[in-house]
């Protein structure tokens, strides 16, 4: 794993707190992201360093929320330390929401010397027109946004779209799929699109949302609230997060244990013949007993 000792000269961090707690927080987020990058092969650092492959380009999605700001800051930090040999392009999709402060992100990105692209597409009108009253906008909004970002990634020559989803997003998605979808699935750290030409990366997928909130406050990011999906009542994701909050209150550390479970899967102890050959289990073969399963 590459060295992630912190340098004080990255412009984005020039005026950040000098407290030990902030330094630990920053280091925790940076090292966590680097571990995800290395574990799931988001970049072939060795091949790039030896010249076998050119520097890839990543399209880093910036919504103006705390998570995407944190994502960009962490990636820039890794890039600055020489641990991420990737060209980064920050991208904001202006979806035409009424009252959206168009000046904030371009000014902040320019001030911090970040290469960026602002895309304007009025998906707001489409979503509010097509989605029936009382239904949530999330699904259609996400599909439209994803299609636009794939297109921009291709136009910019980017091999990957990078998103700021974190551990708590993954757990809420897992619970939604479990309870409402009848399947075991969360958010993958690395995904290939249907056309096979653009990847989706989530380097913060092991980061705690609380850490990102503290980081955003310390960094004084100019947060832009979502006035579409984020303002609707009755979102199932909100319900799942409340459920997880309650479990965390009753048993601190529950979220981290659940996140660990996503990396510790035993297909032989589930019921899906597509991922485990139950029919092929024969006497005399290698067994897989589990003392934690009631007999």
UniProtKB/Swiss-Prot annotation:
E.C. number: 2.8.1.-
Organism for this UniProt entry: Hyphomonas neptunium (strain ATCC 15444)
GO cellular component, one term: cytoplasm
Ligand binding ([4Fe-4S] cluster): 138, 141, 229
Presence of the UniProt keyword 4Fe-4S in the record: yes
Cofactor: Mg(2+); [4Fe-4S] cluster
Enzyme class: transferase
Top-level taxonomy: Bacteria, Pseudomonadati, Pseudomonadota, Alphaproteobacteria, Hyphomonadales
Substrates-to-products reaction catalysed: cytidine(32) in tRNA + S-sulfanyl-L-cysteinyl-[cysteine desulfurase] + AH2 + ATP = 2-thiocytidine(32) in tRNA + L-cysteinyl-[cysteine desulfurase] + A + AMP + diphosphate + H(+)
Compartment(s) where it occurs, according to its Swiss-Prot or TrEMBL record: Cytoplasm
Function recorded in the entry: Catalyzes the ATP-dependent 2-thiolation of cytidine in position 32 of tRNA, to form 2-thiocytidine (s(2)C32). The sulfur atoms are provided by the cysteine/cysteine desulfurase (IscS) system.
Protein name (Swiss-Prot/TrEMBL): tRNA-cytidine(32) 2-sulfurtransferase
């Amino acid at each position: 794993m590459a060295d992630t000792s912190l340098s004080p000269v990255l412009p984005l961090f020039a005026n950040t707190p000098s407290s030990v707690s902030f330094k630990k927080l920053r280091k925790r987020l940076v090292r966590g992201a680097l571990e995800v990058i290395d574990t799931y092969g988001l970049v072939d650092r060795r091949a790039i360093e030896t010249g076998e492959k050119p520097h890839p380009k990543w399209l880093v999605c910036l919504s103006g929320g705390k998570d995407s700001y944190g994502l960009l800051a962490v990636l820039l930090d890794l890039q600055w330390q020489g641990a991420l040999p990737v060209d980064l392009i920050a991208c904001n999709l202006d979806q035409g929401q009424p009252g959206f402060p168009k000046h904030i992100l371009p000014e902040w990105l320019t001030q911090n010397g970040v290469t960026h692209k602002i895309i304007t597409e009025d998906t707001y009108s489409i979503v509010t027109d097509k989605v029936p009253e009382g239904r949530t906008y999330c699904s259609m909004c996400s599909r439209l946004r994803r299609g636009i970002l794939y297109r921009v990634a291709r136009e910019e020559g980017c091999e990957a779209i990078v998103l700021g989803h974190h551990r708590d997003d993954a757990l809420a998605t897992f619970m939604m799929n479990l309870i409402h979808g009848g399947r075991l699935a969360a958010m993958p750290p690395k995904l290939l699109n249907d056309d096979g030409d653009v990847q989706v990366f989530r380097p913060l997928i092991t980061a705690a949302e609380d850490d990102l909130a503290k980081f955003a406050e310390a960094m004084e990011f100019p947060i832009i609230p979502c006035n579409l999906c984020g303002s609707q009542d009755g979102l199932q994701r909100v319900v799942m997060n409340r459920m997880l909050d309650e479990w965390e209150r009753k048993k601190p550390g529950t979220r981290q244990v659940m996140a660990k479970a996503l990396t510790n899967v035993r297909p032989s102890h589930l019921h899906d013949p597509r991922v485990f050959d139950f029919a092929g289990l024969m006497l005399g073969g290698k067994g897989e007993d589990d003392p934690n399963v009631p007999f």
